[in-house]
């Protein structure tokens, strides 16, 4: 078969992404490229037993919105999404003498 007989690679309509939390625990999802990530985020929340409202998801350091799709974010097969629990506060006073 010559190189001209080869069919061009057509990207799959699905990708596999890894969602990793701050404890380096990973959950893998196979998702459609054109479907909102809301479904995956809720599935992750259920899987780890954490309220969805307390989670933040990031790709390349940018927060992911519920209505964004993998195509909109430029997600590719085997990309990693970070999941963080919401942190309240974060401010402390230090008194120096």
Curated annotation (Swiss-Prot):
The keyword Nucleus applies. Keywords: Cytoplasm, Isopeptide bond, Nucleus, Ubl conjugation pathway. InterPro entries: Rad60/SUMO-like_dom, Ubiquitin-like_dom, Ubiquitin-like_domsf. Its main location: nucleus. It comes from the Eukaryota. It is found in: Nucleus; Cytoplasm. Stress conditions rapidly and substantially elevates the amount of SUMO1 and SUMO2 conjugates with a concomitant reduction in the amount of free SUMO proteins. The SUMO conjugation system plays an important function in stress protection and/or repair. This is Putative small ubiquitin-related modifier 8. The lineage of its organism: Eukaryota, Viridiplantae, Streptophyta, Embryophyta, Tracheophyta. The gene is SUMO8.
């Amino acid at each position: 078969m010559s190189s001209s007989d080869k069919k061009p690679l057509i990207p799959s309509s699905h990708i596999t992404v890894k969602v990793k939390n701050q404890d380096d625990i990973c959950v893998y999802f196979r998702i459609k490229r054109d479907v909102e990530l809301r479904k995956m985020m809720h599935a992750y929340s259920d899987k780890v037993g954490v309220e969805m409202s307390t989670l933040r998801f990031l790709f390349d350091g940018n927060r992911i919105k519920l209505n964004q799709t993998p195509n909109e974010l430029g997600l590719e097969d085997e990309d990693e999404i970070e999941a963080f629990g919401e942190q309240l506060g974060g401010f402390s006073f230090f008194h120096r003498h």
